[in-house]
């Protein structure tokens, strides 16, 4: 099972949209996909029509039981979405208390990796929606991942967020004696503005080797798809945003980014 984490320490850059869009594109190709929402705001669940307050269990409950994980326990907290082949391990606001409640316990940084190993034979790909805050959840998301996708809105404030994210991975990589493989993905690109092309140029200059050589354009169909609780691939399959995520998926599946590592 492939494991990808979608992460950035700035909100509003397209993380949740990227998770839903990549997962939807994979489902269109007949792949079994597990999405894991590690953000206490539970945006991914709401996007896909899963109310975090109505689910019988959540990722928080799995963390609480981290010393007694079984495949059956993990599967009992996974819920289906409206799309065949797309499942979700949902978040709740209780995750916001995780650092205070359990963060000091030994082994808490590997809970997500361990739970994914238990269901690895059930799915082709797992995609993690990462919170923007550095803590136990982000540590888990990065540790569990084989590759990290960093969506960056093509505007200058978002580039500052990218700098913090890369610095975080560098620090964590050194402390854990590991190396993180990542790709920077320009999102919300609007060629009609001066800001988007200018920001893209800066990204190319600063992150050339790790930058995906394409963009995710601004597309109102993403908002419409979330209203319908569907990935855009299952709502407006011909739109330019969906086609861009199809190209990104091809890139990720090809695995041509192995040389881009930090740590």
Model regions and ranges:
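P-loop NTP-binding core
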Residues: 1-263
């Amino acid at each position: 099972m492939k494991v990808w984490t979608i992460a950035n320490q700035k909100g509003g850059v397209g993380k949740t949209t990227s998770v839903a869009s990549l997962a939807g594109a994979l489902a269109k190709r007949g792949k079994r996909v597990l999405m894991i929402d590690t953000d206490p705001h539970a945006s991914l669940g709401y996007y896909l029509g899963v109310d975090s307050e109505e689910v019988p269990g959540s990722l928080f409950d799995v963390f609480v039981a981290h010393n007694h994980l079984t495949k059956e326990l993990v599967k009992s907290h996974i819920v289906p979405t409206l799309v065949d082949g797309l499942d979700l391990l949902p978040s709740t606001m209780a995750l916001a208390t995780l650092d205070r409640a359990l963060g000091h316990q030994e082994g808490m940084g590997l809970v997500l990796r361990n739970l994914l190993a238990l269901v690895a034979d059930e799915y082709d790909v797992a995609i993690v929606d990462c919170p923007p805050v550095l803590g136990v959840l982000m540590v888990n998301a990065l540790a569990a991942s084989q590759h990290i996708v960093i969506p960056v809105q093509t505007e200058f404030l978002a580039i500052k967020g990218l700098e913090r994210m890369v610095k975080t991975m560098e620090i964590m990589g050194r402390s854990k004696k590991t190396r993180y493989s990542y790709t920077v993905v320009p999102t919300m690109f609007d060629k009609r503005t001066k800001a988007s092309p200018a920001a893209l140029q800066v990204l190319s200059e600063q992150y050339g080797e790790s930058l995906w050589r394409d963009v995710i354009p601004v597309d109102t169909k993403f908002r419409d798809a979330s209203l319908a609780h569907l990935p855009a691939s299952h709502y407006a399959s011909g739109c330019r945003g969906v086609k861009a995520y199809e190209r990104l998926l091809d890139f990720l599946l090809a695995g041509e980014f192995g040389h881009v590592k930090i740590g």
